[in-house]
Amino acid sequence: LFKHQASGSILADAAHNACNLMVGHNHGNYSIEYTASSSHLYWGAYGGCLIDKDSYAFAYGKHSLRKPVIGCTVILDGRPLLVPMLLDKHGRWVGQL
């Protein structure tokens, strides 16, 4: 299931819907969490983002403790994989995966 935001805990949302859950929008969280019921393994993934944190549109996050994590999530054979964008000290892509 793909959602813009989780309804509470990402794992509780995944289990409630009886499926894995991929969530976007959460700029400061880029992670995968797992849980299991007696019959199924569930994962919930926060997908990172591809924003320009220095643009005016994202000025509201300047003082946030959690900064945006630039990257994407690939789902391969039903498993989520995090692919962070490697940046230099100026915040520019280094040209490598």
For the regions a language model picked out, list residue spans one by one.
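Conserved beta-sheet core of the metallophosphoesterase superfamily
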Residues: 1-87
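C-terminal/domain-terminus segments
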Residues: 85-97
